[in-house]
A protein has these predicted regions:
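Solenoid-like repeat scaffolds
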Residues: 2-5, 38-45, 71-80, 105-114, ...
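A charged, solvent-exposed segment within the mature domains of Sec-exported extracytoplasmic proteins
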Residues: 1-13
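Amphipathic alpha-helical scaffolding segments comprising HEAT/armadillo-like alpha-solenoid repeats
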Residues: 22-40, 62-74, 96-108, 131-146, ...
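Eukaryotic acidic, Ser/Thr-rich intrinsically disordered low-complexity regions
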Residues: 186-233
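Short, surface-exposed, charged/polar-biased interaction segments
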Residues: 18, 33, 48, 57, ...
Length: 233
C-alpha cells in the first residue's frame, strides 16, 4: 500500500478490496493506527481507498482515535462521504455505545442527507456480519427499526430484517404497508418478500390473501424471485 509504484500500490489495494469483512477484521488488528489516520487525511490518497482505511482503524485504534472518527463522521465533503461507511463501522467496533448512538442520530435527524442515511444502512449490514455479541445484535435491530419508520429507507430495512430472519417487527411492518410514504412498487415488493419469508401465522396469512386478491401478478412475480414457484417458460 505504501509502495512508490502506483501499480504495485493499486494491486495491493485491490487485494484488500477483494478480501472478506472477516478477513479484514483480523488483518486490521495488525495495522498501525497513526499510519492509517495519516492516509485518511492525505489529500493525495484516492477517495475510493478511504473507507477501507477507516474500517481498518476499527481493529487497531485506541481511545484517542474515537474523537478522530467522530469528527470524520461530521464532515460533509466528498472525501468525508467516501470515508463514512468505514469510519462508522470502526467507531462501532472501538466504542459500541458511541458508535450506535452516532448511527441512530444520523438516521433520526431530519436534515441528514439521503446519501448519509444509505451509508448508515450499509454500515448496519457490515456490523451484522462481523459483530456477534447479543448487545450488538440488539442495536442492529434498533437501528433498523428507526430506518423502518422512514419511508425512503423502509424497503432496505425490511429486506435486511428478512435476510436476518428477525420477525420481531412483523406487526409494525404489516400495519404500515400501503400508508403514506410506503406505496412505491419497490416498497410493496419488499413488504411482500418479508411476508412470504416470515413464519406463517394468521396475520401473515391474512396479509398475503389480501395482496393475492389486489395484485396477484405482483405476488406471483415475487414468489418467482424467491424461488417459491417455478418460473414460467
Amino acid at each position: 500500500l505504501q509502495s512508490p509504484s502506483r501499480e504495485i500500490a493499486s494491486d495491493a489495494f485491490l487485494e484488500f478490496a477483494k478480501a472478506s469483512d472477516s478477513t479484514l477484521v483480523e488483518f486490521s488488528k495488525k495495522m498501525n493506527p497513526a499510519l492509517l489516520k495519516s492516509w485518511i487525511l492525505d489529500p493525495k490518497v484516492p477517495e475510493e481507498r478511504l473507507g477501507l482505511y477507516a474500517f481498518l482503524l476499527g481493529g487497531c485504534g485506541r481511545d484517542a482515535d474515537i474523537s478522530f472518527l467522530l469528527e470524520m463522521l461530521k464532515l460533509q465533503d466528498s472525501r468525508a462521504q467516501a470515508t463514512f461507511d468505514g469510519a462508522m463501522v470502526a467507531l462501532i467496533r472501538l466504542h459500541p455505545d458511541k458508535g450506535w448512538k452516532a448511527l441512530d442520530g444520523f438516521l433520526k435527524a431530519d436534515d441528514t442527507p439521503l446519501q448519509t442515511r444509505l451509508s448508515c444502512i450499509r454500515s448496519i449490514k457490515v456490523a451484522n456480519e462481523i459483530m456477534q455479541d447479543k448487545s450488538d445484535k440488539a442495536e442492529i435491530f434498533k437501528a433498523l427499526n428507526i430506518a423502518l419508520k422512514q419511508g425512503e429507507l423502509a424497503d432496505l430495512a425490511i429486506e435486511e430484517l428478512r435476510k436476518m430472519k428477525y420477525w420481531g417487527f412483523t406487526q409494525e411492518i404489516l400495519n404500515i404497508y400501503g400508508t403514506k410514504g410506503y406505496t412505491a412498487p419497490v416498497m410493496k415488493r419488499a413488504f411482500l418478500r418479508y411476508a412470504l419469508t416470515a413464519p406463517k401465522d394468521p396475520q401473515i396469512e391474512k396479509f398475503l390473501a389480501q395482496l393475492e386478491t389486489k395484485d396477484s401478478q405482483m405476488v406471483l412475480e415475487v414468489k418467482e424471485s424467491l424461488g417459491l414457484v417455478p418460473l414460467k417458460p
